Amino acid sequence: MSLTCLASNTKEDLNVFIITGNFLKINSGYVAFNKKEIDFLEKIIKIYNPNNRITLLDMSCLEDELMNSTNKNTKFTPYTLLRLYIDDEVFSSIDNRLLYMDIDTMCFGDIKELYNFDLKGKTLGMVRDNVGRHWIHKNYCNAGMILFDVDKTIANKDKIIKAREMIRTVKMFMPDQTAINRAFKDDIEFLPSKYNEQNKMEKDTLVRHYCGVLKFFPYMHIIKVKPWDDDIEKFHKQRKEHVMDKSIEITNEFVRQYKNNEEPYLIK
């Protein structure tokens, strides 16, 4: 769903990296994407632009390291940590920028605007976290969307290593996000909220992030429902949005096509 939103709104060629891994020692449900699935996803995004492509980054080799992490038993899966293990070979193969996006981020415009944002000499571009900026620190950022300056990321590899070490040894709330905030303190350019809108759709929202949202009325609770959940009415009721309805319909049709071993095609 995130990929179709991205591909349908972006005119430029997309070079997509999907990070995955088998972590069955941690949880029997932590199964990597396979080649058949990736090939099907690539066919989907090529519907929008034949030059779009996908590369699979399988990080199953990290299982033992993640098993020994102090943060392995948090509510966050090991997949949230993998953005910190993208290696130099990948960064070196990319010109200028790498845009990381969580699977629950949806684009509502051409991503070129965000990709070309001026980072003013900083290594990372991030949006402040909707909850953490009030409860943790005013400049605490959300890691669901990270814009990397590739050259500076390679030059500042020590900060990546520092973040990995913190995840391995220091118990943290939201470990991946907190480690990034600490390791890259003073090296993050704060981006406008429209590039990672965590609360609700606004008129200028470019990237909507359907992460957990803390609500206080009628009682304190967290909204966790995602666009791909089976109960669409629950999504409408809790998120109070219908902007994803067409994308949900398109995605459900692609899922049906995949299950029936059909070639993907776009419904009207």
Regions found by a protein language model. Name each.
Residues K75-F76, W135-K138, T169-M172:
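Short Gly/Pro-enriched turn/cap motifs at secondary-structure boundaries
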Residues D13-V16, R53, R97:
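Residues at the starts of beta-strands that form the adenosine-phosphate
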Residues N15-N22, M126:
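Short internal beta-strands
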Residues L24-K25, Y30-E89:
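Active-site-proximal specificity loops/subdomain of glycosyltransferases
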